Design a protein with these regions (language model features):
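Short, Lys/Arg-rich, polar N-terminal cytosolic tail immediately upstream
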Residues: 1-10
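Terminal, non-globular segments
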Residues: 10-207, 221-513
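Short Gly/Ser/Thr- and charged-rich N-terminal loops/segments
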Residues: 214-216, 221
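C-terminal luminal/periplasmic domains and tails of membrane-associated envelope-modifying transferases
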Residues: 397-404, 430-674
Length: 674
């Protein structure tokens, strides 16, 4: 396959455009590199970097990743440092290199098919702006390195198959090196090697030259050297991985089940959405034009140019990770990043699809505009939202500003959060006792509860960080105990991390009600527990309502309790709805005649004007929403008043329970969100 040199003028223009695109890629990947919080897995990375190379390997043997990435990152951070910027800069650099490798792959396609001249720059632009690649270029994990070595592997494979000048040393070194690094980086890399091997066999066996040699009745002739060179390179890759192979097999056989099998159409929609927008939790409005283009352009490229064998490697490379996702049922947030290895092939197929349309010079400007618009809609959220990743940094700053360490306790459920929390306690100089539970897997209920009870004794405020509890604490042992014995206040999702505050009052006074109100036919409120009458609560803090229930007969239905704070116009200022005892003791399980201890904390919203507010409660059917009535025909009972005062310390905007953050200046005021 011969190479055709572009005119010198075009070459100079192409070089300048490539330089500008790489500059753009670097700017987007290094911009606000430490602007978002480290999350749990990045905390694990940070913890491993303080250990020796041998200890890293030993710890990785018990984890679900080989040690190669950690070894390389440890060398990198000897110069760059182990703070968030230093660790993430390794991935950012890998992200820029990936964009360059995509360009080189595009140039190889252009050399094979001169009609595709321009595809390399178009694919490079798409990769430079791609939110999926940018997001993982700003994470101290191995997934961008995995995408880079996958792309380098296929670039080397193309060179091995198309070199017109004999053996390409760069291709040989690139294939062997990327194969070795890939296997030592992630256990999913064998699917990429398999795709490369299948690509080689398909192209090699379909070669007209091979068919010609076969027709002569002899062996594969001169092309045998290509075949055995490829076999030798793969043997070298496997040989370099042999020391870790037994560990890898053991870890893969015990791979944790955390994915989800979904229908094909839904899986492809999620795949395309991820390739376009990355880990964005909500796609932009009117996303369908991008999704349609992401699906149709690669299909059009393959259908229009199927006879051109140079596109076959892209097709197999693109499909390999998707087949892995469907085959193992990995469609969940935790595994969508495996699609990064398909992202370079997808970018190239998208560009080829544009160039395969009638009059491509008419279509590429809208394609470029659409790519820029997609990045403009998506990237600001990645750069500015505090919940782009699990916001441990924001929580640490909040505790540093507001918590009283002598009276507080941080509870980590699950223990996998310990390393990232230690990072922020070190760099933010946060001194506060911390308890990680459950300490066994599977959890030991007796030991877990005993440890928790001892730790929370004499602690007025508990700060619970719930993360990945489906695996670490599937029975919700920690949360159920806290719901039963403390008063839940602020509850805020910070990425995939749920931050909850609990209050343990020391001055709670329980008063029997002289005329216990009856809800419906059987439920009575026998006592009310509060710190004082009336309570005094600062805006942003929690009003405490302790309810004591009894039922005179078995209850066939499940009812929810609603506690509401009303202003003078009966507007609801704050509200908490829950099944009794934090959902752990539904009404249809209440023992007849026994007292049910049911504690509720109601967060008074930040910004609530000072003044007196009424507290009411009601019980309602959780299916129909119909409230139980009292003998006076009211469907609520007034508990008393709460006095709201101004807070001494404002709640950080990142922790406010808002659906949308705006931060719009309105003269001397700021509209934070709604």
């Amino acid at each position: 396959m011969s190479e055709r040199q572009a005119p010198a003028k075009w070459q100079r223009l192409e070089q300048w455009l490539l330089f500008l695109l790489l500059l753009l890629a670097a700017g987007l990947r290094f911009y606000r590199l430490d602007g978002s919080s480290l999350w749990s897995d990045e905390g694990n990375t940070w913890a491993l970097l303080s250990r020796s190379f041998a200890q890293i390997a030993q710890d990785a043997a018990a984890d679900i990743h080989p040690p190669g990435y950690y070894w390389l990152l440890k060398l990198w951070t000897l110069v760059a440092g182990t703070n968030a910027w230093g660790m993430r800069s390794f991935s950012a650099l890998a992200g820029v290199l990936l964009v360059y490798v995509i360009f080189r792959l595009g140039r190889l396609l252009e050399d094979e098919q001169p009609s595709l001249r321009g595809v390399a720059l178009l694919a490079t632009l798409l990769a430079a702006l791609n939110p999926f690649q940018i997001y993982y270029s700003q994470e101290a994990r191995m997934y961008l390195l995995l995408a880079l070595v996958s792309a380098t592997l296929f670039w080397s494979l193309y060179r091995l198959l198309t070199s017109a000048t004999g053996v390409s040393v760069g291709a040989v070194v690139g294939y062997a090196g990327s194969g070795i690094v890939g296997l030592w980086t992630h256990y999913s890399f064998p699917i990429v090697l398999a795709a490369a091997g299948l690509t080689f066999l398909v192209l090699y066996l379909s070669s007209s030259r091979i068919r010609k040699h076969k027709a002569r009745g002899g062996p594969l002739g001169a092309n045998q050297a290509i075949f055995w060179r490829f076999v030798g390179l793969n043997a070298l890759i496997i040989l370099a991985y042999l020391p870790w192979l037994p560990t890898a097999i053991a870890r893969i056989l015990h791979w944790p089940q955390g994915g989800e099998s979904i229908p094909f159409v839904e899986g492809m929609q999620l795949t395309l959405r991820t390739l376009l927008f990355g880990s964005l939790r909500e796609a932009p409005d009117l996303a369908w034009p991008w999704l349609l283009g992401a699906a149709l352009l690669p299909l059009w490229a393959l259908a229009r140019r199927w006879q051109e064998r140079s596109l076959w490697p892209l097709a197999l490379w693109f499909l390999a990770p998707i087949v892995l996702m469907f085959g193992l049922g990995l469609f969940s947030d935790a595994f969508l990043k495996f699609l990064l290895t398909a992202s370079p092939a997808w970018a190239l197929l998208m560009a080829v699809g544009v160039w395969s349309l009638p009059k491509p010079r008419v279509w590429w400007p809208p394609f470029v505009a659409g790519s820029i618009a997609l990045a403009a809609f998506t990237l600001p959220t990645y750069y500015t939202s505090p919940t782009t990743r699990d916001n441990y940094a924001g929580i640490a700053r909040y505790l540093q500003a507001t918590a009283q360490p002598a009276q507080a306790l941080v509870i980590l459920d699950a223990p996998g959060q310990q390393e990232v929390w230690q990072y922020y306690t070190k760099y933010d100089q946060l001194t506060m006792p911390t308890l990680a539970l459950p300490q066994q897997r599977p959890p030991d209920p007796t030991a877990t509860i005993a440890t928790l009870e001892a730790a929370v004794d004499n602690r007025a405020t508990l700060y619970a960080l719930f993360w990945a509890t489906d695996e670490a604490d599937p029975e919700r042992l920690v949360e159920r105990w806290l719901d039963q014995h403390a008063f839940k206040g602020l509850e805020s999702w910070q990425g995939n991390l749920r931050f909850v505050t609990y209050v343990q009052p020391t001055d709670l006074a329980c008063n029997e009600l002289s005329s216990p109100p009856r809800f419906g036919k059987a439920i009575r409120l026998t006592a009310l527990c509060q710190p004082a009458t009336p309570q005094t609560v600062a805006a942003g803090e929690v009003a405490l309502v302790g309810l004591r229930w009894q039922t005179e007969a078995g209850l066939p239905q499940r009812y929810k309790v609603t506690v509401q704070v009303l202003d003078s116009r009966n507007n609801v200022i704050a509200q908490r709805d829950s099944e009794p005892v934090g959902g752990s003791l539904p009404t249809d399980q209440w023992p007849v005649g026994a007292t049910v201890v049911d504690n509720h904390g109601v967060l008074i919203p930040p910004g609530t004007p000072p003044g007196a507010y009424r507290i009411i409660i009601a019980l309602y059917d959780q299916n129909s929403g119909e409230r139980l009535r009292l003998p006076d025909d009211h469907d609520y009972f007034v508990l008393g008043e709460v006095e709201v005062v101004r807070p001494q310390q404002s709640l950080p905007a990142a922790l406010l329970p808002l659906q949308q953050l705006i931060h719009q200046k309105l003269g001397p005021l700021e509209l934070v969100g709604y």
